[in-house]
């Protein structure tokens, strides 16, 4: 995944033969999104990297592969940089950090008397259904310039305290990735015979949390689900 096996070869034992090209296309999104957009005649931007060019045609092949999966923009990286940024992103803003932020804000709202529905809508639903599509299309600066004046002032005042509070966590995370500790943790966890059972228990805990139970209710109330 994103060059994991080859980058951490001393841990995975994956060493490609010297007589083959070793290339990578890394679409910036989930496999389900990549497939859906491909069927719509669109695609995701991707990074590409060449670890070995045994044939002299590795560059041609990797670019063709990127175009073939529908990437509109390709940017060059290395296997090492790709897997470092990927592991950091997954544990950070893409999944780990955002779940932590969701949970913290939801908890504060509930502790101060807000209903589960209100807390979920203000924490998750408005962000994912309204704001992030606008940020994706126009950028965060546009979002700040075009929101209400109360939201604008508050966002400008509070984003730096949030940055300062989370920066040490992100620095620790990147250091763990660079040291190979996150890779080893993933390898060790996935190698255990009871990994699937423990994973199911962790996911069940999240799924049955009040926040995501409220989320299931809110999603079912979306207008498109009641046609």
Question: Which residues are covered by each model-predicted region?
Answer:
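Rossmann-fold dinucleotide-binding core
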Residues: 3-88
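Active-site-proximal catalytic alpha-helix in oxidoreductases
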Residues: 56-111, 117-135
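A broadly tuned preference for mixed-charge, low-complexity surface segments
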Residues: 25-32, 53, 97-104, 158-159
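NAD(P)-dependent Rossmann-like dehydrogenase/reductase catalytic/cofactor-binding core
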Residues: 45, 49, 111-227
């Amino acid at each position: 995944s994103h060059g994991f096996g080859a980058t951490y070869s001393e841990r995975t034992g994956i060493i490609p033969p010297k007589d083959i090209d070793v290339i990578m296309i890394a679409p910036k999104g989930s496999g389900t999104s990549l497939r859906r957009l491909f069927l719509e005649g669109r695609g995701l931007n991707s990074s590409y990297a060449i670890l070995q060019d045994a044939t002299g045609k590795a560059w041609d092949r990797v670019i063709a592969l990127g175009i073939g999966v529908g990437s509109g923009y390709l940017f060059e990286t290395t296997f090492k940089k790709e897997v470092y940024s990927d592991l950091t992103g997954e544990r950070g803003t893409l999944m780990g950090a955002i779940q932590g932020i969701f949970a913290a804000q939801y908890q504060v709202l509930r502790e101060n008397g807000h209903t589960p529905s209100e807390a979920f809508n203000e924490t998750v639903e408005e962000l994912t259904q309204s704001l992030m599509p606008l940020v994706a299309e126009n950028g965060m600066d546009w979002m700040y310039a075009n929101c209400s004046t109360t939201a604008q002032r508050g966002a400008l005042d509070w984003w730096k305290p949030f940055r300062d509070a989370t920066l040490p966590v992100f620095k620790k995370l990147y250091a763990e990735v660079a040291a190979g500790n996150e890779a080893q943790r993933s390898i060790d966890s996935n190698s255990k015979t009871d990994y699937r059972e423990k994973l199911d228990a962790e996911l069940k805990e999240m799924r049955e949390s009040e926040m995501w139970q409220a989320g299931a209710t809110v999603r079912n109330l979306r207008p498109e689900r009641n046609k």
